[in-house]
UniProtKB/Swiss-Prot annotation:
Function: One of the components of the core complex of photosystem II (PSII). PSII is a light-driven water:plastoquinone oxidoreductase that uses light energy to abstract electrons from H(2)O, generating O(2) and a proton gradient subsequently used for ATP formation. It consists of a core antenna complex that captures photons, and an electron transfer chain that converts photonic excitation into a charge separation.
Protein name per its UniProtKB record: Photosystem II reaction center protein J
Record note on quaternary structure: PSII is composed of 1 copy each of membrane proteins PsbA, PsbB, PsbC, PsbD, PsbE, PsbF, PsbH, PsbI, PsbJ, PsbK, PsbL, PsbM, PsbT, PsbY, PsbZ, Psb30/Ycf12, at least 3 peripheral proteins of the oxygen-evolving complex and a large number of cofactors. It forms dimeric complexes.
Gene Ontology CC: chloroplast thylakoid membrane; photosystem II reaction center
Keyword S-adenosyl-L-methionine part of the UniProt annotation: no
Protein family according to the UniProt entry: Belongs to the PsbJ family.
Organism encoding this protein: Cyanidium caldarium
Topological relation to the membrane, as annotated: Single-pass membrane protein
Length: 39
């Protein structure tokens, strides 16, 4: 595999994981805070 000039796969997976966990965390926090009930 030639990965020159491209973003490393591990970096994409790590960044994607952080984004997903952050979004899920905000959604769960909003649900417990009562903000999720208004959606």
């Amino acid at each position: 595999m030639n990965s020159t000039g491209r973003i490393p796969l591990w970096l994409v997976v790590t960044f994607g994981g952080i984004v997903v966990l952050t979004v899920l965390g905000i959604f769960i926090y909003g649900s417990y805070s009562g903000l999720g009930s208004s959606l």
